[in-house]
C-alpha cells in the first residue's frame, strides 16, 4: 500500500486483543493449589510489567504511565499508557497505582494503551486447571500493535489463543479524502512467523468490509507430560493416562470452539 500523506494527526485506532490459555491437570487438591500458586507467581504484576514494557519497545511506543496490581487470592493486572511521540523522562509517572488512574489519564487511556489481566482457575473435582491472560494493545496513530504479535504469544505459555484485530475511525489525506485503514491486511496470520504457524492449527473469521479480523489457534502437538503438574505420566496406569488425556483434550476443544461438547 502506498504511503499516505496525511492532513494532521493519524486518527485511526488499531486494537489487538488476545485471549491466551494454558491448560494443566493437577490430580489432588494440593497439586491444584500448587499450580494456581505457581502460575500466579510466574505471571505476577512485576513480570507482566516487564513483558508489556518490552511490547512498547517493539511497537515503538513511549511509556507515559504504568498502573499495576496483584490480587488476592490470585490474579494480576497491568495497564500502560503510551504515546507515539517521545516524552521527557522527567515527566513520566512510574509509581504504582492500585486503584483507577486520574480522570485526565483515563481520558487519554482510551486512545493508546496496553493492558493485561490474568485469571487462574481450577475445577474442584475434575483436576483441570486453566490460566487465562487477556491482553489488549490499542494504539492511535501510525504505531501498529501487530508488531508485538509473535513476542506476546511466545512470552505466555499458550495452548489456545484467540486474537481479534480491528481498525476504527478514519484519517484524512492532504486532499481531504477519508481513509478507514492505512495498511494492507487480509489475515492476522500474515503477521506471524513461520515457526509459530507450524505449531498451531488456525482458523480465521474475518469481516473485511468492517476491518474486523479474528484468528483462533490450537496447539497441534499434545504431549501429556507437558500438562501434568507434579505427576509423571509413567507413574499412572494406562487407563488413567487415557482418561486424563481425554479430559484435557475435551477441555481444550471446548475452549477453542467456545462451546460445551459431549463426552466421548
From Swiss-Prot:
Mind telling me which GO cellular component terms the entry cites?
cytosol
GO function term, MF aspect, one: adenosylmethionine decarboxylase activity
Query: Which EC class heads this enzyme's classification?
Result: lyase
Listed under GO biological process in this entry are: spermidine biosynthetic process
Query: Post-translation: what modifications?
Result: Is synthesized initially as an inactive proenzyme. Formation of the active enzyme involves a self-maturation process in which the active site pyruvoyl group is generated from an internal serine residue via an autocatalytic post-translational modification. Two non-identical subunits are generated from the proenzyme in this reaction, and the pyruvate is formed at the N-terminus of the alpha chain, which is derived from the carboxyl end of the proenzyme.
> What are the EC numbers?
4.1.1.50
State the active site: 112, 117, 140
What chemistry does it catalyse, as a reaction equation?
S-adenosyl-L-methionine + H(+) = S-adenosyl 3-(methylsulfanyl)propylamine + CO2
- InterPro entries, alphabetized: AdoMetDC_fam_prok, S-AdoMet_deCO2ase_bac, S-AdoMet_deCO2ase_core
Q: Please give the residue positions where the record annotates the modification Pyruvic acid (Ser).
A: 112
* Cofactor(s) demanded: pyruvate
Key words of the record:
Autocatalytic cleavage, Decarboxylase, Lyase, Polyamine biosynthesis, Pyruvate, S-adenosyl-L-methionine, Schiff base, Spermidine biosynthesis, Zymogen
Asked whether the UniProt record includes Kinase among its keywords, one would answer no
Describe cofactor binding as the record notes it.
Answer: Binds 1 pyruvoyl group covalently per subunit.
Q: Where is this site: Cleavage (non-hydrolytic)?
A: 111-112
Q: Which NCBIfam families match?
A: SAM_DCase_Eco (TIGR03331)
Q: Assembly and interactions?
A: Heterooctamer of four alpha and four beta chains arranged as a tetramer of alpha/beta heterodimers.
Q: What does this protein do?
A: Catalyzes the decarboxylation of S-adenosylmethionine to S-adenosylmethioninamine (dcAdoMet), the propylamine donor required for the synthesis of the polyamines spermine and spermidine from the diamine putrescine.
Name listed for the protein in its UniProt record: S-adenosylmethionine decarboxylase proenzyme
Which organism encodes this protein? Escherichia coli O45:K1 (strain S88 / ExPEC)
Q: What is the lineage of its organism?
A: Bacteria, Pseudomonadati, Pseudomonadota, Gammaproteobacteria, Enterobacterales
Amino acid at each position: 500500500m502506498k504511503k499516505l500523506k496525511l492532513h494532521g494527526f493519524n486518527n485511526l485506532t488499531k486494537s489487538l486483543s488476545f485471549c491466551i490459555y494454558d491448560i494443566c491437570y493437577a490430580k489432588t487438591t494440593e497439586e491444584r493449589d500448587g499450580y494456581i500458586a505457581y502460575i500466579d507467581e510466574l505471571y505476577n504484576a512485576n513480570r507482566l510489567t516487564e513483558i508489556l514494557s518490552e511490547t512498547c519497545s517493539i511497537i515503538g511506543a513511549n511509556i507515559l504511565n504504568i498502573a499495576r496490581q496483584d490480587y488476592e487470592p490470585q490474579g494480576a493486572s497491568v495497564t500502560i499508557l503510551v504515546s507515539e511521540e517521545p516524552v521527557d523522562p522527567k515527566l513520566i509517572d512510574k509509581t504504582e497505582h492500585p486503584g483507577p488512574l486520574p480522570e485526565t489519564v483515563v481520558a487519554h487511556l482510551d486512545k493508546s494503551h496496553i493492558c493485561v489481566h490474568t485469571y487462574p482457575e481450577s475445577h474442584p473435582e475434575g483436576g483441570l486447571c486453566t490460566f487465562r491472560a487477556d491482553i489488549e494493545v490499542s494504539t492511535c496513530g501510525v504505531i501498529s500493535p501487530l508488531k508485538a504479535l509473535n513476542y506476546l504469544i511466545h512470552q505466555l505459555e499458550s495452548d489456545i489463543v484467540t486474537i481479534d484485530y480491528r481498525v476504527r475511525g478514519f484519517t484524512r489525506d492532504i486532499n481531504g479524502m477519508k481513509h478507514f485503514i492505512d495498511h494492507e491486511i487480509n489475515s492476522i496470520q500474515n503477521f506471524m512467523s513461520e515457526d509459530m504457524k507450524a505449531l498451531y492449527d488456525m482458523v480465521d473469521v474475518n469481516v473485511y468490509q468492517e476491518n474486523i479480523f479474528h484468528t483462533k489457534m490450537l496447539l497441534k502437538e499434545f504431549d501429556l507430560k507437558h500438562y501434568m503438574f507434579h505427576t509423571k505420566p509413567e507413574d499412572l496406569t494406562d487407563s488413567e493416562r487415557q482418561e486424563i488425556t481425554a479430559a484435557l483434550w475435551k477441555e481444550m476443544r471446548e475452549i477453542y470452539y467456545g462451546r460445551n461438547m459431549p463426552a466421548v
